[in-house]
Amino acid sequence: MVLGSLSCDKCKKGRYRGQSTQGSKAKVWGWEQSCQACPSGKYSNQEGLATCDDCAKGKYQTSCEAGSSDGFAGYAGCRQCKNCPKGWYQDGNAQDDCKHCAIGTYNDLTAQKQSSSCKACPNGYSAGSTGSPSCDACIPGQLTTTSGAFSDKKQCYNCPAGFSAVGHGSTSCAGCGSGKISGAGESSCSSCTAGRTPNSDSTACVDCTSGKFESNNVCQDCPEGNLII
């Protein structure tokens, strides 16, 4: 458009003018600045719009990004809304950000529209921060479960002393076998050294008492006529 023209040019994509000029630029010098950028949470993907459209659920638009269009200063970020990233969702329209999944849950898809898209981590996994796109497998010696003391998927929990979990992503702990012990959070059980046996709950090794010796992980009385050496 040139000065003195009787016609108006349409506002570019990502901008709007308002109802007074029906989406066109003003007829005076400086008309290019009369088209405004869409506000946060809105966009325009057509020219000549009097208003901007709301971002749909699952999407957002924070601010307009600088760019260029047909030789004019443009607003590329206002031409479309962005998908909420993995680990996030948006259940409202015309929003300028997304809502994060809570600790212990995850969401592995973009543009999600409901809080129900955030799913609890499976057993043997946890999500220790908000907005998680995936869950982390519990390390050996730790676990999570469906119910009970280890069901909080916000973190993985140590197997109690006397138990162990060998692999990653464990959902249960196994009790130490005969003659073996473990501390809390251990991936395997260990044998007691000679002359010592496991205590009753397999959490520590204890010395055989005076007059007894260890044989096959059991403290036994020394036979009459024999000495402990």
Residue spans of the language-model regions?
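Disulfide-rich, cysteine-dense extracellular ectodomains and adjacent flexible linkers of secreted
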Residues: M1-I229
